[in-house]
């Protein structure tokens, strides 16, 4: 009786080097709606999507600019000099630089904190702080807010000299002393946008670094061990040919038998990303309140700012100004009070000009002509 020859089992070579890379902004992947600790997510939103970072910068610059009027000339001169040269953090000077950093924090996190530094009975500096390192506690009455910060041992406790601290919230919700960021509602869409961009980058990387599939077709009578040895020889020659190509040397690939070479994924079309990216960006930009073309997004060849858009944007900027005006008034009044002067001041904000100057002049002319005709008719 003949024994059946035992077939030689050859281990197949499996090579799967596809990594699980995703976009580097990990906080967006772990976003939980209406959760806490969203400050890191908001920072990553600005870093990941340049349009949002540009939107915050433009809103800060558009809302900035004011003058302060005092009751007497001497107080006016001293206050103007102080506001133009007051030290801020990180080597910056002037109340405008302080207000820019304060507004940046207010728009990003929904709240901002600052401090008036008093030394020798005088107001020496005005600084803004990291609001993410602080906690807010409601006092005994709804009008009292206590700011907590870490001490030398890292424990949270109420900060001393609460009267010298500046705190502002934007659109606070009932029952919460924290404000609302303009980025709330964006992380979900931003995560989808990051996946699209990461996929686009991966596809282009593979297009520039093509992966090949080399198939050696053998007959039915080919021994498995021989087939494996032949496959290793073909793989070695193919790798050697590819390495020589990197060095600028042309090397031919010669193989015996039926060898089929294909580009992995070469027959699969790349998905069109223009429509989904535009749909997501439309919602993100709409949340900022800025016209798209101000952020470099030209979705229409004849796009321009209409009168209605200018009015809406102006109202948004004035709302931001009204939010931070009490902080500016407190700084000015504290400085004048410590100087022993009348601390009554008025904040005069600069006009927000978003329309063409020629169009505004034409509109003023039409109004003047209309008033003239009405006066003559009477």
Where are these regions (language model features)?
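Structured, contiguous alpha/beta core segments that scaffold functional sites
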Residues: 1-57, 61-65, 69-257, 264-266, ...
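Long amphipathic alpha-helical segments
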Residues: 141-169, 230-314, 318, 322-359, ...
């Amino acid at each position: 009786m003949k024994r059946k020859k035992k077939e030689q089992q050859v281990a197949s070579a499996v090579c799967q080097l596809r990594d699980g890379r995703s976009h580097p902004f990990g906080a967006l992947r772990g976003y939980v709606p209406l959760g806490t600790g969203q400050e890191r997510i908001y920072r990553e939103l600005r870093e990941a999507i340049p349009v949002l970072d540009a939107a915050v910068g433009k809103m800060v610059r558009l809302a900035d600019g004011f003058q302060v009027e005092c009751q007497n000339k001497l107080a006016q001169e001293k206050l103007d000099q102080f506001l133009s040269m007051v030290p801020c953090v990180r080597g910056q000077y002037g109340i405008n630089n302080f207000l820019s950093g304060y507004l940046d924090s207010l728009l990003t996190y929904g709240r901002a904190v600052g401090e008036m530094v008093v030394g020798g009975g005088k107001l020496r500096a005005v600084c803004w702080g990291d609001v993410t390192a602080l906690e807010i506690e409601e006092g005994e009455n709804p009008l009292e807010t206590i700011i907590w910060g870490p001490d030398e041992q890292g424990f949270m406790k109420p900060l001393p000299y609460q009267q010298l601290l500046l705190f502002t919230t934007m659109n606070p919700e009932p029952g919460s002393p924290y404000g609302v960021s303009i980025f709330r509602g964006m992380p979900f869409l931003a995560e989808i946008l990051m996946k699209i961009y990461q996929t686009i980058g991966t596809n282009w990387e593979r297009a520039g670094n093509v992966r090949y599939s080399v198939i050696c077709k053998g007959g039915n009578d080919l021994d498995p061990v021989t087939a494996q040895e032949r496959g290793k020889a073909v793989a070695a020659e193919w790798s050697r040919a590819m390495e020589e190509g990197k060095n600028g040397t042309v090397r031919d690939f010669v193989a015996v038998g039926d060898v089929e070479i294909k580009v992995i994924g070469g027959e699969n079309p790349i998905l069109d990303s223009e429509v989904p990216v535009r749909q997501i960006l439309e919602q993100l930009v709409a949340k900022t309140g800025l016209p798209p073309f101000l952020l470099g997004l030209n979705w229409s060849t004849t796009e321009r700012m209409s009168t209605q858009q200018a009015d809406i944007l102006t109202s948004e900027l004035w709302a931001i100004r009204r939010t931070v005006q009490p902080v500016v008034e407190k700084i000015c009044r504290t400085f004048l009070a410590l100087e022993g002067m009348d601390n009554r001041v008025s904040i005069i904000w600069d006009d927000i000009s978003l329309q063409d100057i020629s169009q505004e002049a034409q509109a003023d002319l039409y109004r003047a002509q209309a008033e003239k005709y009405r006066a003559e008719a009477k």
